[in-house]
Design a protein with these regions (language model features):
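Acidic/histidine-rich catalytic neighborhood
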Residues: 46, 55, 76, 83-84, ...
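Extracytosolic (periplasmic/ER-lumenal) interhelical loops and adjacent juxtamembrane/interface segments
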Residues: 109-122, 128, 132, 202-211
């Protein structure tokens, strides 16, 4: 009797709590859930995909002319651009366009100098505090690892492993750059912020829409649209975060091929050994 009474009280409390939560959600404000980015087709998708160097060079151009005013690439060195098809002279010329901090010198002071090939892409801000002051408390993140850091939430990564889906990062970046919309009437957006349903940290962000049609010129005839810009810079950021992807895929394929051949040889050797033992055993039994 006592157990039944206690159970009834617990059920009543759970029911009341659920109704109270549902009422709060429906009457006060809706819970924001970010949209899932659409899967894109990339040259580097799948186990055998590789980077499109022309696209990477276009993405670098987008980063330099648009993104670098707010975001750094502290883990990418100028000399790494050799993988994009740049020779040593072009890399040196590209690095000289940037001003980097160095020192201390003999007088113990820090100074500015032109970049060299061994330098990394500098941050546009002296420190985090300066960035937050300029952008009303928001801090533009470094983009070096962004394409690898933005993955999907559980349990989707489990299915991604089985289907070899490894482009969630560039898919997210593309969706974010092209996903700016007018906020719904029943959704409150902080002044100076922009609504983007793909932003994983909330319903709005401090970054204004950075891309527009015709913003950056391409000499190879590639369409100069927001969608193309977003895809190009997303591919570039994927390379920045995972520059050794192609080597890893080739090495992995060779290792798997070796293991398959090795397993086949071991199996054949096993059959041969056991057949030999069976024949010897049969001879001994006859003798």
């Amino acid at each position: 009797m006592v157990k039944a009474f206690i159970g009834l009280i617990i059920i009543s409390l759970i029911s009341f709590s659920f109704q109270s939560f549902a009422s709060n959600v429906s009457d006060k404000e809706k819970v924001f859930v970010s949209h899932v980015p659409k899967k894109q087709e990339w040259s580097f998708s799948g186990p055998f995909g590789g980077y499109d160097k022309a696209q990477l060079r276009r993405g670098l151009k987008i980063y330099k002319q648009v993104c670098s005013s707010c975001h750094g690439l502290k883990y990418v060195a100028f000399r790494d651009l050799k993988a994009l098809g740049y020779d040593q002279e072009k890399i040196k010329a590209f690095a000289r366009q940037y001003e980097v901090s160095d020192g201390p010198n003999r007088e113990g002071k820090f100074f500015k100098r032109a970049g060299v090939a061994t330098d990394t892409f500098p941050s546009p801000f002296a420190n985090e505090e300066e960035a937050r002051f300029i952008y009303k408390g928001a801090y533009p993140p470094d983009l070096s690892l962004m394409a690898r850091a933005r993955t999907r939430t559980m349990p989707l990564p489990i299915s991604d492993i089985l289907t070899y889906y490894n482009t969630a990062g560039p898919d997210y970046i593309t969706a974010l750059l092209t996903g700016y919309q007018k906020a719904p009437e029943d959704m409150k957006i902080t002044d100076g912020y922009w609504y983007n349903p793909y932003f994983i940290a909330g319903n709005s962000l401090a970054m204004a829409p950075p891309l527009s049609d015709g913003l950056v010129s391409y000499k190879d005839g590639t369409p100069e649209t927001v969608e193309q810009y977003a895809r190009d810079v997303s591919a570039f950021l994927m390379w920045a975060a995972d520059p050794h992807m192609e080597i890893r895929k080739k090495t992995g394929f060779r290792v798997i091929l070796f293991l398959i051949i090795f397993a086949g040889l071991v199996y054949v050797l096993k059959i041969w050994i056991w057949n030999s033992l069976e024949n010897e055993f049969e001879k001994e039994m006859k003798d």
